[in-house]
From Swiss-Prot:
InterPro entries: MetalPrtase_cat_dom_sf_prd, YbeY, YbeY_CS. This is Endoribonuclease YbeY. Zn(2+) binds at residues 118, 122, 128. GO terms for cellular component: cytoplasm. Pfam families: YbeY. Its EC number is 3.1.-.-. GO terms for biological process: rRNA processing. The lineage of its organism: Bacteria, Bacillati, Bacillota, Bacilli, Bacillales. GO terms for molecular function: metalloendopeptidase activity; RNA endonuclease activity; zinc ion binding. Binds 1 zinc ion. NCBIfam families: rRNA maturation RNase YbeY. Keywords: Cytoplasm, Endonuclease, Hydrolase, Metal-binding, Nuclease, Ribosome biogenesis, rRNA processing, Zinc.
């Protein structure tokens, strides 16, 4: 079973956010052909907390919109254990998501979905450190969002 564990450090999250992200990432999981027995976490934080995480773990002392930590990187495979595949953690700054939705002229729901999917693709190994990787990741991101029906309109 695909499991997403949600945590809210802001006190502002509602169940609709959880459901939207759960539906989108379940759709993306199928699009990416990820096995059903997988899990990840999504945590909502404020600007101060995401800046601290960004500083402490990425050496970037600034606010950002989403950070993901893939738990599979450099992990040895353990054979014979019937355990779910743990993909990692996605951390979303709800305040920045609201600001970016307004700045880009689309709904908060679309921005939230975009950030959750962006973090999810990072957990699967996609990146945008060079032009070719960026083209692949952003193309995949757009295709999944379009197929799901979460457009910029």
């Amino acid at each position: 079973m695909f499991t997403i564990d949600f945590t809210d450090h802001t006190g502002e999250v509602n169940s609709e956010w959880y459901q939207q992200i759960d539906n989108l990432l379940t759709f993306a999981k199928k699009e990416e052909k990820i096995e059903d027995d997988a899990e990840l976490s999504v945590t909502f934080v404020n600007k101060q907390e995401i800046q601290e995480i960004n500083r402490d773990y990425r050496n970037k002392d600034k606010v950002t919109d989403v950070i993901s930590f893939a738990l599979e990187e450099d992990e040895p495979d353990i054979e014979g254990l019937d355990m779910p595949r743990v993909l990692g953690d996605i951390i979303i700054c709800a305040d920045v998501a609201k600001e970016q939705a307004e700045e880009y002229g689309h709904s908060f729901e679309r921005e939230l979905g975009f950030l959750a999917l962006h973090g999810f693709l990072h957990l699967l190994g996609y990146d945008h450190m060079n032009e070719a990787d960026e083209k692949e990741m952003f193309g995949r991101q757009k295709l999944i969002l379009d197929n799901y029906g979460l457009t910029r309109d």
